[in-house]
Regions:
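Short conserved motifs of the RecA-like P-loop NTPase core
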Residues: 18-23, 32-46, 71-74
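Peripheral, non-AAA+ core regions of ATP-driven protein-machinery
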Residues: 20, 88-89, 97, 121-296
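Conserved P-loop NTPase
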Residues: 47-50, 57, 114-116, 120, ...
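The conserved phosphate-sensing helix
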Residues: 45-59, 69-72, 87
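Extended amphipathic alpha-helical scaffolds
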Residues: 68-118
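Conserved RecA-like P-loop NTPase ATPase core
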Residues: 1, 5, 18, 41, ...
Length: 296
């Protein structure tokens, strides 16, 4: 018989929904709790199931110790006992900064997250350092184990190669890219964020702190599609971003209704035009600037 089953995927719950689940679970348990506890539970919970499990641990602890009210102290104990770690939810910075850009990623639990990307450029040297990423990955198969270089580092190398094709020599500059925050980053989807961070550091033009972006960058300046765009857009909005750039091939019409400005771009030239619209910046202008000015 032909199967008529449909595979259904559920999107990860946002923090507000997880807080509501924790609140309902505590209410059903019939125990009082200090103000703000539901938000603290949501900070540890990767989803509704984690929230319910934490509440069950908390109510059991309160019952064993004869307590009538659950506090943050009990939550910390339950989280440590269950090996829950606070989930990383970064907010946008308060002001723009040269060489700093908001990238977007997806965590292991399927939730989107804001990723700060920092770039420093020094003239008179050469080389590339990328920190805060997964340096290499082990791939195991039936015939043994192989090691693969980090996709994030490969994306950074693509950025420098792209700049060289526009007349800039990477041999004259030392570039350091960093992903702060303690989360090992991998994957090519931070390519456009790294490109923009390096461009900002080169030209000393700050990028708006309310902007976030995602996309892979190709060697000829194309912005390539990536996964997890819906989760990334939700994370950008939650973090306080007001504008997000995504690959044109990832565009969907319903992105008009998200309460955040979503701009599709196909090339890095389009990206720079969208980012530096008021300055009228273009990549060629940035390269001319570099060739005329020493940057330390």
């Amino acid at each position: 018989m032909r199967s008529r089953c449909t595979e259904i995927f559920f999107e990860p719950l946002d923090r507000t929904a997880v807080e509501k689940i924790a609140e309902n679970s505590l209410r059903r348990a019939g125990i009082s709790y200090e103000e703000g506890l539901c938000g603290r539970i949501a900070a540890y919970a990767g989803g509704g199931r984690d929230a319910v499990n934490l509440v069950q641990s908390l109510t059991s602890l309160a019952w064993m110790e004869g307590k009538k009210k659950i506090t943050a102290r009990e939550l910390e104990w339950a989280a440590e006992a269950g090996r829950y770690q606070p989930l990383y939810r970064q907010k946008i910075a308060k002001q723009p900064q040269v060489g700093v850009v908001n990238g977007l990623g997806v965590q292991g639990n399927g939730r989107g997250t804001l990723l700060s990307v920092e770039a420093v450029v020094q003239k008179g040297g050469n080389g590339l350092t990328v920190t805060g990423i997964v340096e290499e990955e082990e791939l195991k198969n039936g015939q043994g184990t192989a090691k693969r270089k980090s996709n994030a580092r490969s994306a950074a190398e693509n950025v420098l190669t792209l700049l060289e094709q526009f007349g800039f020599s990477a041999q004259d500059f030392y570039v350091h890219l960093n992903f702060p925050g303690g989360i090992p980053v991998d994957g090519p989807s931070a390519g456009v964020a790294m490109f923009l961070a390096v461009y900002s550091a080169f030209t000393e033009i700050p990028v708006a702190h309310t902007l976030a972006l995602t996309g892979e960058v190709g060697l000829h300046g194309q912005v390539l599609p990536v996964g997890g765009v819906e989760q990334k857009l939700a994370a950008a909005k939650e973090a306080g971003a007001t504008k997000v750039l995504i690959p044109k091939q990832n565009w969907k019409e319903n992105y008009h209704n998200l309460g955040i400005e979503v701009i599709p771009v196909a090339t890095v030239q389009e990206l720079l035009g969208a980012v530096f619209l008021s300055e009228g910046a273009a990549l060629s202008e940035g390269i001319d600037f570099l060739q005329e000015k020493e940057i330390g």
